[in-house]
Structure formats: structure tokens, C-alpha cells
Amino acid sequence: MSKPKYPFEKRLEVVNHYFTTDDGYRIISARFGVPRTQVRTWVALYEKHGEKGLIPKPKGVSADPELRIKVVKAVIEQHMSLNQAAAHFMLAGSGSVARWLKVYEERGEAGLRALKIGTKRNIAISVDPEKAASALELSKDRRIEDLERQVRFLETRLMYLKKLKALAHPTKK
């Protein structure tokens, strides 16, 4: 598992600063180098769950399917915002909630239950030298064609500009 972007201590420092000063989200965001929406999320988590809400969640761990359904239904039935739902259910952010809503709208509860979040995709990258060489050659050919087309365009443009200049300033014989 990777290290969280913002450690617990920094989150707590930001939230404490919010409650002990009159500074708004924008000023705190600039002072601590944290996005304003992140400050807002941490404040909401702290208000709802205390310091426990600020503990970073491990990355790559997928949420329980029943929790996903509960969150989506709360957003729809209780008219919660994505940020409110994330804070209420102690989720890392509203991005997951938005993704779950989209899946729910497209495939319903079954789609949320079947959703595999946090699984790594296995993308096979071909390292065939012949294919790589032919792809490089093809890209060079395309680049040459594009440059030739651009040269023709610029030459034509220059010709029209010269013709326009000649018509605008006729020489006397």
C-alpha cells in the first residue's frame, strides 16, 4: 500500500487551524498547500467523526458492496451532496461516490455489487522490435507528410499575400 498524500498530523493541523482562526477555506488552502475542497472535506469529517475521521484510509482497498449501495441510496433518497455522503460514511473523498452513482444509474444495485474497485489492470505491452520499428517508420512518414502539407499551405498563403499586396499597390508604368 502506498503512503497517504496527506498524513494524519497535517490533516489535524489544518482542521485545528480552521476552528481556531477566522480564516476561510481559501486562505487555509493557500497557507497549507492543500486543495480547498480537501480542507472542506476534512472539516466535515472532523465535525461528524472527530479525529477518527481524519485517519487516512489505505489505498487500493475496495469498499464493501453493501456500503456502496447504502451510500448511493443516501445520496438519492436523502438528497445528500457527494461531499456530505463521503463525510457521513467516512470515505476518503467524493470521487468514489460519484463513480458509484454513475454505476448505479447504468446497472443498478447488481452493478454496484459486481464492481471491482482497487483491482489492478493487467495491460500487456508489446515489446516486439519489428513492430516498434515499423510503428516508428510509420510515424516518421506521417510527420513528413504533415510537414509537406504545411509547407504547401504556407507557400500558397505567401503567394496570395504577394498577390494582394500587388493589387493594393499597383506600380505605374
Curated annotation (Swiss-Prot):
The keyword Nucleotide-binding does not apply. Transmembrane segments: none annotated. Gene3D superfamilies: Winged helix-like DNA-binding domain superfamily/Winged helix DNA-binding domain. One of its GO terms (molecular function) is sequence-specific DNA binding. It comes from the Bacteria. Keywords: Transposable element. It holds the Pfam family HTH_28. Belongs to the IS150/IS1296 orfA family. This is Insertion element IS150 protein InsJ. It comes from Escherichia coli (strain K12). The gene is insJ.
